Amino acid sequence: MANSKRDLFLKRRLRVRNKLKKMADGRPRLSVHRSGKNISVQLIDDVQGRTLAAASSLEKDLGIVGKNNVEASAKVGAAIAERAKKAGIEECYFDRGGFLFHGKVKALADAAREGGLKF
């Protein structure tokens, strides 16, 4: 029987998380969540279990409320890179969860890299 989209999503999420656990060396994790209309990202310190920085397309100061396109994702990526610099973070792991590295997720990652984050 064919797997549903949800089953495939969960398999990808577990596979990505297990790869990140193998590489764990104290660097924070850049966790991405994408919905139908919005995208959000957090820098998470898994050792202490706390969020170090976050950005979302729902934030009014980014000026992208109501837009759910690739350009909005790029603005969120630039915002998280700027906030990571303020927090003193230069390197992290990119945790795409179960989302494919394409479109909005890729635009966010590219903008974060251009902003100075290394992953």
From Swiss-Prot:
InterPro entries: Ribosomal_uL18_bac-type, Ribosomal_uL18_bac/euk
CC annotations in GO: cytosolic large ribosomal subunit
Gene assigned in the entry: rplR
Any one GO molecular-function label of the UniProt entry: structural constituent of ribosome
NCBIfam families referenced in this protein's UniProt entry, alphabetically: L18_bact (TIGR00060)
Function comment: This is one of the proteins that bind and probably mediate the attachment of the 5S RNA into the large ribosomal subunit, where it forms part of the central protuberance.
UniProt keyword annotations, A-Z: Ribonucleoprotein, Ribosomal protein, RNA-binding, rRNA-binding
Self-association and partners: Part of the 50S ribosomal subunit; part of the 5S rRNA/L5/L18/L25 subcomplex. Contacts the 5S and 23S rRNAs.
Protein name: Large ribosomal subunit protein uL18
Highest taxon in the source lineage: Bacteria
One Pfam family in the UniProt entry: Ribosomal_L18p
